[in-house]
Amino acid sequence: MEFSIKSGTPEKQRKDCVVVGVFEARKFSDAAAVLDRASQGYLGDILRTGDIDGKPGSTLLLHSVPGVAAGRVLLVGLGKERELDEHSYRKALRAAIKALHTLDDADVAICLAEVPVKKRDTAWRVAQVVEIAEDSTYRFDRFKSKPANGKKGIAKLQVHVTRRSDVAEGEKGLRQGKALAAGVSFAKDLGNLAPNYCTPSYLAEQAEALSDSHGLQVEVLEKEDIEKLGMGSFLGVTKGSVQPPKLIVLQHRKGKKSQKPVVLVGKGITFDTGGISLKPGADMDEMKYDMCGAASVLGTFKAIAELDLPLNVVGIIPTCENMPDGNATRPGDVLTSMSGQTIEVLNTDAEGRLILCDALTYAERFEPQAVVDVATLTGACVIALGHHASGLFSNKDSLAEELLDAGNEAYDRAWRLPLWDDYQSQLDSNFADMANIGGRAGGSITAACFLSRFAKKYDWAHLDIAGTAWKSGKEKGATGRPVPLLTEFLKQRAGK
């Protein structure tokens, strides 16, 4: 989709469609009022019929409105004028984009960014238009032999602002929205790929391509390098697969040379059968999404590179498959991690923490200001929080607050769960320093407790995205979360 910013009167726009907002109680937005005057009260007559009530997300598509150059006018409900908030605004945008999906290769002008939203500026309103337009029209059809029958929808979207003086702010919002949308789409594409395509080697190739196109530094460590580092926990997960593991290290170095980096660690299990502790067959196909932590790190790097954030950021992605095989790790095996701590593997399906713990130890060499790991780690987190909020754990209150604030700002929310010492005893083992599981009770918490044992030398947070990284059912597909949260967090760290 091609985006642009413009100020000007909506009635003169020679477009396939002009989108304007209406409020409840038959009240016009400023742009809608201009169209009503140009049409000599035509829109007012439409509102009086009650065909659209102005409630958030309601729409009405009109054709050949008198006095308006555009072929169509889409009215979009915004709710009560004095109560227009972020939620209602975003709902209206989604409804508008959905209503226009029947158009074919359309050139559209949207005048919703002109409407005041509580505590939000022009740049934010414009960025939301771009992000929601791209998200709502995203399709993954790489493996379709024939293109889906249907219209192409919107080809060009011109975002209108009220005054010429607003154009610069609008352009800023356009850049931010496009960068974030690109990062989210990249993460979605990686998540949606079939696991016979998206292997650890493929992820490494994508990281290298991203580095080449966006001026990043990248290093891909092979199995031999991982062995030399003493990452016995990571290697224990890889033993059942013919796909070679990779440790991908990305660097965005745009901060001061003396600035310590923020480190993002992404779980990259490109397919998870559960290993010897084999998962049930039902819905196992969705275990291709077990690399969405890695995908979100790559997507975030794409976004911050396009934003040219003045910050030093390191991405660490341990990636492999978890497969059953004659060589695979067995329940009862003891692994020695890079930190020297030993782990009794009671369940090979609790493998994400086994690759992450070595990556967290590896992160120490960068002397980070903070480390955030991202992982589709536990089904227990889905039971606790459902599919709306990611689980957040941290050993530093101020870091947790930053991430919570970033999630609220980006509408990619998280909820903090406890990391109390009381839970640590559930990981006790008779045969090693710890077990890799702590029983059914508090499963997401004990998983975070496990990781915390490898993150004692820096400020650390863990995002469990098992409930938010993808959708099942009719809308099955990767969501791209938490790229918005992570990008906003890094923007705030960079002072942007």
From Swiss-Prot:
Binding site for Mn(2+) 1: 272, 349, 351
Protein name (database record): Probable cytosol aminopeptidase
Keyword Manganese: yes
MF terms (GO), sorted A to Z: manganese ion binding; metalloaminopeptidase activity
Cofactor note: Binds 2 manganese ions per subunit.
Known catalytic reactions: Release of an N-terminal amino acid, Xaa-|-Yaa-, in which Xaa is preferably Leu, but may be other amino acids including Pro although not Arg or Lys, and Yaa may be Pro. Amino acid amides and methyl esters are also readily hydrolyzed, but rates on arylamides are exceedingly low; Release of an N-terminal amino acid, preferentially leucine, but not glutamic or aspartic acids
Protein's UniProt keywords contain Manganese: yes
Cofactor(s) recorded in Swiss-Prot or TrEMBL: Mn(2+)
Alphabetic keyword roster: Aminopeptidase, Cytoplasm, Hydrolase, Manganese, Metal-binding, Protease
Catalytic residues of the enzyme: 279, 353
InterPro entries cross-referenced by the UniProt entry: Leucine_aapep/pepB (IPR011356), Macro_dom-like (IPR043472), Peptidase_M17_C (IPR000819), Peptidase_M17_leu_NH2_pept (IPR023042), Peptidase_M17_N (IPR008283)
PROSITE patterns tied to this protein: CYTOSOL_AP
List of residues binding Mn(2+) 2: 267, 272, 290, 351
An individual GO BP term: proteolysis
Pfam family, one: Peptidase_M17_N
GO cellular component assignments: cytoplasm
Gene source species: Methylobacillus flagellatus (strain ATCC 51484 / DSM 6875 / VKM B-1610 / KT)
Intracellular or extracellular location(s): Cytoplasm
Family under the similarity heading: Belongs to the peptidase M17 family.
Gene: pepA
Functional note: Presumably involved in the processing and regular turnover of intracellular proteins. Catalyzes the removal of unsubstituted N-terminal amino acids from various peptides.
The protein's Enzyme Commission number: 3.4.11.1, 3.4.11.10
